[in-house]
Design a protein with these regions (language model features):
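Short, Lys/Arg-rich N-terminal segment immediately upstream of the first membrane anchor
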Residues: 1-7
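Hydrophobic membrane-insertion alpha-helices, especially the h-region
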Residues: 9-25
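Export/targeting segments at the very N-terminus of extracytoplasmic proteins
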Residues: 28-83, 106-109, 124-125, 200, ...
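Catalytic and substrate-binding regions of cell-wall glycan-acting enzymes that process beta-1,4-linked
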Residues: 36, 149-211
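Second-shell loop/turn segments in exported
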Residues: 40-47, 57-61, 83-92, 112-124, ...
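Surface-exposed patches in mature extracellular/periplasmic domains of secreted proteins
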Residues: 69-72, 85, 114, 141-152, ...
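Cell-wall polysaccharide-cleaving catalytic domain and substrate-binding groove, primarily
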Residues: 77-95, 101, 133, 156, ...
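Substrate-binding/active-site groove segments that recognize
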Residues: 89-112, 129-132, 171-177
Length: 211
């Protein structure tokens, strides 16, 4: 075995050990280091990609009297600003809309209902329909705060109304989720989504404070 090959094998072994250690060692959030590095890179890249779309986000949000930073936060949570994404449940594009919600939004805007490929690849239309859908959630349930709107955007208005009715109110449903979390049980993914989106919204507010 020549020296170059021995060096290569040693490097491969070292890399394998580093990856293994990366999965065994956890960060302060309890994530394996390897996973933390990948996730943090994806998040920061998403902030940059969504930020590059700020002019379009600002104009689309303005049409629906929405906070553009909130819309940017949703885009970050849904697609990380990457075009052409399809979720496991069939949600499409930058704002991750299902066809039924997109068709309803298009009807409210006086537009033709988009087909699958149009909704997936027409970023401007996807953004406009996503903003209209968010505005519809806001207007149809005015008592909801930003967190509740985001939960509904993620899981569906009907489902959140059902959860709130079962708990007695939205606030009581949130309280029940926090009790679960305190007891070491998983919190609703939709509530986690909403709270992370609000944190990202705040980051965009700081970044584009002058707009």
């Amino acid at each position: 075995m020549n020296s170059a090959r021995r060096v290569l094998i040693r490097l491969l072994i070292l890399c394998s050990l580093l990856v293994a250690v990366g999965w065994l060692v956890h960060d302060d959030q309890g994530r394996p280091i390897v996973r933390a590095i990948v996730e943090d890179y994806s998040k920061q890249r998403g902030i940059r990609l969504v930020g590059e779309r700020w002019p379009a986000i600002f104009e689309a949000a303005k049409q629906e009297d929405l906070d553009p930073s909130l819309v940017a936060g949703i885009m970050w949570s849904e697609s990380r600003g990457v075009s052409g994404r399809v979720s496991s449940v069939g949600a499409l594009g930058l704002m991750q809309l299902v066809l039924t919600a997109a068709s309803d939004a298009a009807e409210r805007l006086g537009l033709e209902a988009p087909d699958h490929d149009t909704l997936l690849h027409d970023d401007a239309l996807n953004l406009a329909l996503g903003c209209n859908h968010l505005a519809w959630l806001r207007d149809s349930t005015p008592e909801w705060n930003a967190e509740a709107l985001l939960v509904a955007y993620n899981t569906g208005r009907g489902r959140l109304l059902e959860w709130s009715q079962e708990a007695g109110s939205y606030q009581l449903w949130v309280a029940s989720q926090e009790v679960r979390h305190a007891a070491g049980r998983p919190m609703s993914p939709a509530l986690i989504y909403a709270r992370e989106t609000l944190r990202v919204r705040n980051a965009f507010r700081e970044q584009f404070a002058g707009d």
